[in-house]
């Protein structure tokens, strides 16, 4: 079938910022789709708000817009670019929602919807239309009722019964949904679900909790050829969102006739929807009976997993199908000889385990339900289920608490939390049987037997074992670290037992055809498929699962390093990573991909298999950097012909070690806040007293400010120290003087050991004290004096050269009373590197990679950027997905993702950034303000400005009295505890359009938390710092005076 010859230009809508339910998988799929369409000569216009994506790179698409993903703005881009088609299925739920909205507002006249037709979007996303379609084609769905008004609750309970599952239409990651066991729960979940749904609709359906959950990834072309790319089976039963479940591929517990029944149904459904491209279909299955649960008529999170599990490039194939190609006309890039119409075959086991953020959010509700809470996931490949399970757990890279109390174990098994998968192992260790656990969890006994096999092996290794038992353990995924702990043998004795892992290839065809894209996993079988060669090779350590503090930004840096090194003649680039969502784990990103845990032992096994010129650790974030020192020690011990490239591990340690770094700053005559390191509680008390409260306390070697806190007195310090020491047992507690009312600055730079290139100086909107990852920031700085900027440049160069940095460095400063203080230096990639690249056009990560293999900055001819526009980075906070989380921003990071606003002045750029972060600032209506007594004087100019702009002010008694006394009109509204009607009632009614609420202290946080929770639930923009309120007033002022600019990114960089 010929390509659609009239499709010359296609618009792809990205998925926006990383958030719970929608992570890096859509950068992976969107980037793949852009490349696929450009291969076919189609011009690609891409719009996305997330600067930390590969798809927003200038060489991914022909025209790139970094703009808020709002239908009215995308409509302007469509009018300007005049695309022939729009590809909606690559941007996740956001892309589908935007396409539906654009169609409804008439913006798609003359624009063909490619791949997923509009009717399929409606039938897949509108719960009533989906149910009607399934009934029409004779496919069973759970008994259900559509609910659009709260007065239908009693009828829904009578019709469907309890427990019931609530599924809102057009939402992401099950947002706003849940399982209701009582009428009260039903009312609470339905109210939230209706508020979150784009069309104010929820489906209340009978619960099939406890049934098996099975997924099929299906592909279909215009000639009606359908294939199953991958079947996947959730270890967790129905009742837990698939994104929260442990997932196994291929399907292992269905008989062939059962599998064929579901396969036939999946193909029937994709045909009924008329989807041309990829589609994800979810089934509930029990004892020969099944129900259709959900259809995603787009590339999804499960698509990314299926793609990495099989090696089949789903997004690439779907994009080519969308412009008219048949499956048999599209080549499988992994084999290079088979068409995409061949169903993939796999001869190994893949396991996905989610990564949850509860190490950051101690107060969050950890219960797993139908709404997602995980931020990322890991994938492991093994020859057996046991091996894949063990490798997946190792890949999570977090401390799993062991449970020994049978009552506690029973509670976790019956009311699942993020601890349940690990607790299955604990249950067997404490003597639970397979039958008992199956009854408590509804998990298929097959998987429980595999976990029991692992625990039985542990017992054998702890007692009397034979060398053969060690070999069996290794084939079951046990690491050398596991073996040392269990056998109590020395490393030498374990090594003497012999054996090294072999590497097998993921090739989509179970070795039926040779693969041209080398994609490997380790196992302890015979026959290694990895071939040693003489090429000059570099191994880059990836960043692992997305978590708070370590997001897609580090994958961006990893991919840029690969791109840069592949431009250098004669360098072969290999990646090790375990995140199935990312571009770096796309099989054709690097010359060789290893899907492995990011542990010292696993990395060393790779290095021992081939001669590597060097290893790069600074692009994968703090976790990769933490491997630098032990990796170098092992390389030396084994006398391997490789080295850590770029900044030396000793220099990294000098930046992390507080005492060494302080001595360097003293020698360079650069100011820093008074600080010290304490190795005991007593030392900490003494040093905090000497420095003077308030102090900032944190463990050393942390990621994203983990366990960092602002401490005001000795009592707070004592309660904190226990937590900090537990988080980082091997390292001291760091105590810093807290600089109140200071402006914070971030700098990203590259050094080659001789020269330093400063890529960007970013001024934070929020003052020091809010974690840099949670603060909005702006390039170029808006309030810093030339003298301050000159000192920041000078200090950056001195520190980079003083540490001996070769590659990237990020330095954080605070400015108070015209003094520039250094807060910390990180000689590695930072989360702001992609933002700097998109704001300035300078690809720092690429430059750094070249410097690390010997290139000099002077030879590259890269000048420090000077820009005439303004770019603002704003963050996305996860409070709408994590009930119970404290919404107060502080020194510990909470955001999951970021967006960028770009325009020709600060006000409009900040307005765009807030809009992109789903915090759109109102230009009319009522603003509720509540601030501390200390902040009231600072509030006054902001309040006056908002009144000048025509907004009405509301507040509680203290704030209203102060404003009125100072000539600013304000209206009184009651506090929550003062009875109704109060501020929450006003928010619920829709009369409040913006919240400015800064909590005074821990005692006043309860009011703040209630107000902020209501703001999140009812979608009201909120501001928690006065600095952000000041910026918001500037943004509203700017937007009322002048329209925002809609221009391609290339225009800002002078490339178009």
Curated annotation (Swiss-Prot):
Mg(2+) 4 binds at residues 824, 826. Mg(2+) 2 binds at residues 294, 296. PROSITE patterns: ATP_GRASP (PS50975), CPSASE_1 (PS00866), CPSASE_2 (PS00867), MGS (PS51855). It catalyses: hydrogencarbonate + L-glutamine + 2 ATP + H2O = carbamoyl phosphate + L-glutamate + 2 ADP + phosphate + 2 H(+). ATP 2 binds at residues 698, 737, 739, 744, 769-772, 812, 824. ATP 1 binds at residues 127, 167, 173-174, 206, 208, 213, 239-241, 282, 294. Residues 531-920 are annotated as: Carbamoyl phosphate synthetic domain. Its cofactor is Mg(2+); Mn(2+). It holds the Pfam family CPSase_L_D3. Pathway: Amino-acid biosynthesis; L-arginine biosynthesis; carbamoyl phosphate from bicarbonate: step 1/1; Pyrimidine metabolism; UMP biosynthesis via de novo pathway; (S)-dihydroorotate from bicarbonate: step 1/3. Mn(2+) 1 binds at residues 282, 294. InterPro entries: ATP-grasp, CarbamoylP_synth_lsu, CarbamoylP_synth_lsu_oligo, CarbamoylP_synth_lsu_oligo_sf, CbamoylP_synth_lsu-like_ATP-bd, CbamoylP_synth_lsu_CPSase_dom, MGS-like_dom, MGS-like_dom_sf. Mg(2+) 1 binds at residues 282, 294. The keyword ATP-binding applies. Mn(2+) 2 binds at residues 294, 296. The keyword Acetylation does not apply. Keywords: Amino-acid biosynthesis, Arginine biosynthesis, ATP-binding, Ligase, Magnesium, Manganese, Metal-binding, Nucleotide-binding, Pyrimidine biosynthesis, Repeat. Its EC number is 6.3.4.16, 6.3.5.5. Residues 398-530 are annotated as: Oligomerization domain. Mn(2+) 4 binds at residues 824, 826. It comes from the Archaea. NCBIfam families: CPSaseII_lrg, PRK05294.1, PRK12815.1. The large subunit is composed of 2 ATP-grasp domains that are involved in binding the 2 ATP molecules needed for carbamoyl phosphate synthesis. The N-terminal ATP-grasp domain (referred to as the carboxyphosphate synthetic component) catalyzes the ATP-dependent phosphorylation of hydrogencarbonate to carboxyphosphate and the subsequent nucleophilic attack by ammonia to form a carbamate intermediate. Composed of two chains; the small (or glutamine) chain promotes the hydrolysis of glutamine to ammonia, which is used by the large (or ammonia) chain to synthesize carbamoyl phosphate. Tetramer of heterodimers (alpha,beta)4. This is Carbamoyl phosphate synthase large chain. It comes from Methanoculleus marisnigri (strain ATCC 35101 / DSM 1498 / JR1). The lineage of its organism: Archaea, Methanobacteriati, Methanobacteriota, Stenosarchaea group, Methanomicrobia.
